[in-house]
Amino acid sequence: MAKYISNLSRIAVVRGRVSVSTLVKYPRIVLGIETSCDDTGAAVVDENGTILGEALHCQKDIHLKTGGIIPTVAQHLHRDNITKVVNKAIHASGISPYELSAIATTVKPGLGLCLGVGLSYSLDLVNKYHKPFIPIHHMEAHALTVRLLHPVEFPFLVLLISGGHCILAIVSGVSEFVMLGHSLDEAPGDTLDKVARRLSLINHPQCSGMSGGEAIEHLALHGNRKICKLKIPMSHHRDCNFSFAGLRNQVNKVIEQKEAEKGISKGQLLPCVADIAAAVQHTVALHLAQRTQRAIYYCKREGLIPTERACLVVSGGVASNRYIRKALQTVTHESDMTLLCPPPRLCTDNGVMIAWNGIEKLQSGVGVLHNADGACYESRASLGRDISELVRKAAIKVQPIKILS
């Protein structure tokens, strides 16, 4: 009988005769779609934080062979897989698309060709099933993923580290961000990937199928970082901005020197790759930790985060790196703060974080479009209000960091 009533309710809703809320108070449900870079993700999540269904197609193996992400190739792969991925997530959830409360999709920032695939597909669904559309800022979604798992209250400090971004910000609300600092050139994930390619780690027997960042972390476990002396970027700049291009240039010079010493040609594996990996990882970790430490000092001084029970959230693909987490744990321990990171599978791009961000926006009534005409994607997009210049003018000195063992 219950199943029969449920089916009648669904039919009534589908036919538009009554609303779900008229029948029974069901939790709202959002379908999230992610195609900003090289992962095609979809998930169905309800407002209780239950992941009803999810699916992901990763393009990593293909891009490893081409030596990096080629936008046209990524676009083609998204087109080939998006229908299958979305259908798999919906099927796993056990619900009908008519039961969705809204459809949320990444529209910024990212690779334009890839964003376009997700947006076009989503708008087709929106029109077919007559659902509200929720455009999602990719980095906002990363920042709020932790709230799916932990009752983190606003405001909190967030460090977003990935292959495309490096941002320190205060999160004051679902769509309220204040940026303290960002990368002036490339992102840490991009740097680690490029170093891995320069070291030809794709040819290392222990690194088969690993991304550049994964290979660096794996080899660093057995390396001696003290063999290669690398300078921490921007040590004399008392702000919260980041720079990684100079570090990569340092590493390239070290590699060239080692190749000359060993008589090894470019493209061949050096015997000291683990040492170089350990040195690079350590330097990236210290750079991130020092800037984060300054951000904490600044925020507490200015009353931007609570003085007690304050929280640092770290998210994005690079947040999966355990050594970098350890460095940041050192900072939060000394500052009497809690460090929270989503599990690795939710740090990298996925549909769950998009669906959850859609739920949060739906609950707060922010950014929900009942008419999606004119919805568009943006390859570049800022994150909230930028006060990085105020942080620079504060010129806060930080203490040297020793990563806890």
Swiss-Prot record:
Pfam entry (one): TsaD
UniProt-listed GO biological process terms: tRNA threonylcarbamoyladenosine modification
GO molecular function: metal ion binding; N(6)-L-threonylcarbamoyladenine synthase activity
Reaction equation(s) it catalyzes: L-threonylcarbamoyladenylate + adenosine(37) in tRNA = N(6)-L-threonylcarbamoyladenosine(37) in tRNA + AMP + H(+)
Annotated transit peptide: 1-19
Cofactor(s) demanded: a divalent metal cation
Keywords on record: Acyltransferase, Metal-binding, Mitochondrion, Transferase, Transit peptide, tRNA processing
Main function: Required for the formation of a threonylcarbamoyl group on adenosine at position 37 (t(6)A37) in mitochondrial tRNAs that read codons beginning with adenine. Probably involved in the transfer of the threonylcarbamoyl moiety of threonylcarbamoyl-AMP (TC-AMP) to the N6 group of A37. Involved in mitochondrial genome maintenance.
PANTHER family in alphabetical order: TRNA N6-ADENOSINE THREONYLCARBAMOYLTRANSFERASE (PTHR11735), TRNA N6-ADENOSINE THREONYLCARBAMOYLTRANSFERASE, MITOCHONDRIAL (PTHR11735:SF6)
NCBIfam families: gcp_kae1
UniProt protein name: tRNA N6-adenosine threonylcarbamoyltransferase, mitochondrial
Gene: osgepl1
